Amino acid sequence: MLTNPSQALIRNSKYFQQHSVLVLNYEADTFAHQCLEFADNVTALALDYNHHLTLSSCANEKLQSYFGHQLPESLADTKFDSVIIYFPKAKPLMGYLLQLAAQHLNVDGQLIIVGENKGGIKSIAKLTPDYYSQPIKQDNARHCLVYVSYLIQAAPTLSIRDWVSQYSLETPQGTLQICNAVGVFSEKRLDQGTDLLLSHLPDNLRGRVLDFGCGAGVITAALLKANPELTIECIDINAMALLSCELTLAANSMQAKVYPSDGFNQITGKFDGIISNPPFHDGLTSTTDIATQFVQQSAIRLTSNGIWQIVANRHLPYSETIATHFGKVNVVAENNKYKLYLHQR
């Protein structure tokens, strides 16, 4: 099943007939594979690890699938006839994607942008740098818009540092330097949930620790500030978050293993601690299901004397799930928005 933006692209396949195509920020479908019906070859870069997993099983000699904030070094200088960008949910990320696309186009190369009507794509003309021609709307279908532009002059060389902000953050463990890549949400201050978590960290945390949904690495950096002996693994599905986490660790002269994982699927072994401000707060049924799976998998992945501590929106129904899988619910702190759950075996 193709998403609406992908269906809109298929309607406009005439723009990439027999082209070598780069697809940036693709969605959780197999459009890039179906694109081979029209294109000569396709290279796809996902910024969401789940989207990458959806497509990677279809990879072949004419379809290359990658995950990350940019293509591998071996493809850094590769040019394509056309670059397709799916308009991102985080609007500021579009500027980065436009410059990234330009690195892989020759002058006069074609840029195709697709996005949902209500997703911000109508502002594309204001967002497009002057090294592209003015984007022209080519189609309005499936509640989506399709624009085409061309590279009219060479773009500045992309430096990821130009798309990363760094700031000092005060935490209960001390001052940290936090790096935020574009597209990663940050208030540039400690949010209520993370503040509650860091204010009540267990002092007996030891060994191998998992930071689930690490974001920019605030929790990991605070943990290592308090206890440099910890062996921490940081996982997320967002490429820009993983990049942010790596840069945050470097800025604080800290080390941890940072890698993508779809839930616990890419993780091996058990942990002495799982500490998290998990990324499910909206209360939707699908989100609640993911949260339930998180608790269930946490119980499996925790060592016999492990520590599990998470902070979550107080309205989310964690208590019943925690009782089912851990046997006891301990709320060690709370405020008007969040609850802090702790389980020590």
UniProtKB/Swiss-Prot annotation:
Pfam families from the UniProt entry: MTS, MTS_N
Gene Ontology molecular function terms on file: 16S rRNA (guanine(1207)-N(2))-methyltransferase activity; nucleic acid binding
Domain of life: Bacteria
Primary location class: cytoplasm
One of the record's GO cellular component terms: cytoplasm
Subcellular location(s) of the protein: Cytoplasm
UniProt entry keywords in alphabetical sequence: Cytoplasm, Methyltransferase, rRNA processing, S-adenosyl-L-methionine, Transferase
Record text on subunit structure and interactions: Monomer.
Annotated protein name in UniProt: Ribosomal RNA small subunit methyltransferase C
Species per Swiss-Prot/TrEMBL record: Shewanella frigidimarina (strain NCIMB 400)
Top-level taxonomy: Bacteria, Pseudomonadati, Pseudomonadota, Gammaproteobacteria, Alteromonadales
Encoding gene, per UniProt annotation: rsmC
